[in-house]
From Swiss-Prot:
Function: Methyltransferase required for the conversion of demethylmenaquinol (DMKH2) to menaquinol (MKH2) and the conversion of 2-polyprenyl-6-methoxy-1,4-benzoquinol (DDMQH2) to 2-polyprenyl-3-methyl-6-methoxy-1,4-benzoquinol (DMQH2).
Keywords: Menaquinone biosynthesis, Methyltransferase, S-adenosyl-L-methionine, Transferase, Ubiquinone biosynthesis
EC number(s) per entry: 2.1.1.163, 2.1.1.201
Gene: ubiE
CDD domains: AdoMet_MTases
Organism: Sinorhizobium fredii (strain NBRC 101917 / NGR234)
Protein name in UniProt: Ubiquinone/menaquinone biosynthesis C-methyltransferase UbiE
Superkingdom: Bacteria
UniProt xrefs under Pfam families: Ubie_methyltran (PF01209)
Gene3D superfamilies (alphabetical): Vaccinia Virus protein VP39
Amino acid sequence: MTDERVSADGGMETSFGFRDVGTGEKQPLVNDVFHKVAKRYDVMNDVMSAGLHRVWKDAMIAALNPPRRENYRVLDVAGGTGDIAFRIVEASGRKAHATVLDINGSMLAVGAERARKKGLLGNLEFVEANAEDLPFAANSFDAYTIAFGIRNVPRIEVALKEAYRVLKRGGRLLVLEFSEVEMPLLDRFYDAWSFNAIPKFGKLITGDEAPYQYLVESIRKFPNQRDFAAMIRTAGFGRVSFTNYTGGIAALHSGWKI
């Protein structure tokens, strides 16, 4: 399942929130959203998840369980502010090397400054590039992680194929993403929170409601857990599975390059 489709005029289109846009138009629109929220990105995630993103990210790192060896290489995509990469490096006893890739320079600038303050620059590399066209050789990384970023990629299936390409044989893909709530009653509460509260809190925090409105809508347009797992299999991964967090508000997807 992919959100990309043929438009009425014969071109390719995809979704930007609840809007239909040309596939080539989505990335600049997404970039604008994250330029606006870069300095308040962690606060944004607190608003989007009621603070639970921190628990989910810790669970993601526990699932990865990075070894304490210096030649362990991780690619963290859409990881500009470094939140996942920092956790991976610390969990490895500051042995692992993480490449933080993001298409948004504002997000990377925030991450690099945070890494400097934490004394982690020796374990990290920051690369501005597109998830659909990774600037790395095949079989380069032991793990590929992406947290709350895959739904913003215009062509998700292309990004997944690139993930498969750059992973070493035996390498692991981990995708943490907002998902479809599967717990009765929680889905109603979460819808009310998402569409009524989140944009208003976003406006209070940043002075701009629009980025938060897009982010809420983008969650609803993202494939459900089973459909996204099928996309991961189609990209070539084996042993594909997912784990729901907080009743399905988020899900951690796992796949291996076998």
